[in-house]
Amino acid sequence: MRLQPLSVSLVLALTVPFALLPAAPLLAAPSASARQADAAPVLVTAAQWQQMASEGSRYPWFAKEQARSQKTLQKMMKAGIDVPVPRDKGGGRTHEQHKRNYQALLAAGTLYRLTGDKAYVDYARDMLLQYAKLYPTLGPHPEGRGQIPGRVFWQVLNDSVWLVNAIQGYDAIRDALSTEDRNTIESKVLRPMAEFLVSEPKNYDQIHNHATWAVAATGMTGYVLRDPELVEKSLRGSQKNDQFGFLRQIDLLFSPDGYYEEGPYYQRYALAPFLLFANAIERNEPQRKIFQRRDGVLLKAVDVLVQTSYGGLFFPINDAILDKGIDTEELVAGIGIAYARTGDDRLLSVAQQQKRLLLSPEGLQVAQALAANKAKPFDYRPMLLRDGPDGDRGGLAILRMNGERGQALVQKDTMQGMGHGHFDKLNWLFYDKGNPVVTDYGAARFLNVEAKRGGIYLAENRSWAKQTVAHNTLVVDEQSHFKGDWKRGEEHAPQVRFFQADADTQIASAMMRDAYPGVVFTRTQALLRHPDLALPVVLDLMQVHGDKTARYDLPLHFNGHIVSTGFEAEHFPAQRPVLGADNGYQHLWLDARSKPGSEPRSLAWLLDGRFYTYRFGSSAPSQALLVESGANDPEFNLRREPALLQRVEGQKDVTFFSVLEPHGEYNGTAEYVHGADSRIREVVRTRGSDAEVIELRLASGARIALGVADDSSAKGEHSVTVDGHAYRWSGSHARIDRSKGDGK
């Protein structure tokens, strides 16, 4: 798990080649005297520093960032150096002070190079010498969690983050220090910390974002200390057998499209060490061609991370904090490095939204390009991002219409996402008008808020946020997918059936086996545009096949204020029952419940001046339940959010079908309402011999039909008759429109 945001706005990124190590196999670490013979900076060259110092003030973005950094650091310097004995969890005083210290070390090294002011050197040196006194006295952190506590921080991950930052600041001042001070700092702090990280294989020899930070920290330290052995272990694993290490992580954690296994939130977090260390490798060993590895997957990952956002915020799948977005400092580093290597002017518009850049060679390039007005709009587009190292372990389908703040549908057909993954196969989210409309809870956590259990993941993360009922996908017999075992979940990925993205029809379909014994479910979703509809609509088809009768629940978590319920229901205004006893159900209040029925129903809500009408039905009698999160939550850790749950009892097979329609406008200031009535009159589902058709009947008389074959590989013709009209198509699926007056 991840606790600390990296202060990347000052990260010293690396661009042009600087050959330090030979192409031949690396040898044992050189002697201390040999390492000290050359103290020149290697993470950013002296020539690059000189260019930034002489040219940076000419470019407003760079000059503004430098001024901001100077103001922040001078405030820290005025407060004095504080290197406390570690004692607190995340968010506590000593924890936060050590964070501020690595930020200060990074800033001091940067500003020394940009200004030539030796006061910055003195400040950084004195702080590092205090760490040289403290670090040898430290054992496992007193608040350490799990099997691998850190020394400076309560988890070893944060020690890695400290070193990634501190080593860059140290590299910038190293040649301004005396030999004695260099020896003390390196032998008492930097080398012992790097060796501590390498000595913990349960953290270091892993395929995980924790290990990425660790290998980046040790590898960058190895380059600065001229220690080829440290570099080799960072690249190939502590045993140098290529089973772990940085290169193996690149090969296994990203799909060929650049999608990161743990999802966007953790892609954002891991992006900084991946790119910063890759830059260090490119500088010192350009013959490795690290940015070309796997067809440039690290640079693809930058584009993918921006693509997996809406309204500036990342899609909150898996253990995600909802307020993390493209202005996060890790992506500031990513945009700068990616722009320097690709020259893609569309990345500059992202930099403009971030309102930040690096005080680095890449940051200077971004500032120069922005001053030259080269920025172009970023190309947010529909896409299928394959998951898994070979791209065959499901994927994330993104359907988009009407630009960055238009309509976006995200169908989550990805792998488990390791321990940070949620039990939500074939889950979906929907965005419109800059807002999340069909929502995902993300993580139950208040990051670094000490009053909320020290800022760690709360107990409700396991009891609610990870559970399947907290998401918009199928629940069988009130059990979560894989019975809540993420390691079992890692073994089974969805199968992508098809994906299509045209101007008026975008569609994705996937199948999931093994989430429940004997149950197979398939979800097909489409984003459809039609001239008789005000805005694109979402069509959703969930087909479930089981080998025994079961209870099937299909939740829809939505954002907005309910306007109308198109079904009769029993209400519980005086006393709110709790929906269930476990697997997330214990956290749901039951507010209303309909009787079982087969007729299509509707629910309408209002969000940010726009209406949303959700029409839904099923092939077997179902109940509609209106629920809200927050039950059994004595510490008020959960947000109170509404959901609609469709429930079918005692069936082996069932098909759920629905359409979500955005429409109309409510303006409270001007006191008017336009288009509050749905333009869809009815949604009809019809089953054929080997396919299904969902037909939308519009108020205009037009009809939109989506035909979906059971076998997505079938090339032959399919036919389904709806009220006397035969819909025929070939292949896996087809959209078929009928205008008013078309005969049967």
Per-region residue spans from a language model:
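Positively charged n-region of N-terminal signal peptides that target proteins for export
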Residues: 1-5
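Non-catalytic terminal regions with compositionally biased, polar/charged low complexity
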Residues: 644-654, 660-744
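Extracellular polysaccharide-recognition and catalytic grooves
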Residues: 185-425, 429-436, 572-584, 588-608, ...
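Catalytic and substrate-binding regions of extracellular carbohydrate-active enzymes
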Residues: 357-575, 652, 662-665
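Aromatic-lined, polymer-binding surfaces characteristic
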Residues: 41, 46-57, 62-65, 74-78, ...
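Bacterial N-terminal signal peptides
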Residues: 9-25
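Boundary at the C-terminal end of the N-terminal hydrophobic targeting segment
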Residues: 23-28, 32-34, 39
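Short, hydrophobic/aromatic-enriched beta-strand segments in well-ordered soluble domains
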Residues: 556, 613-631, 654-666
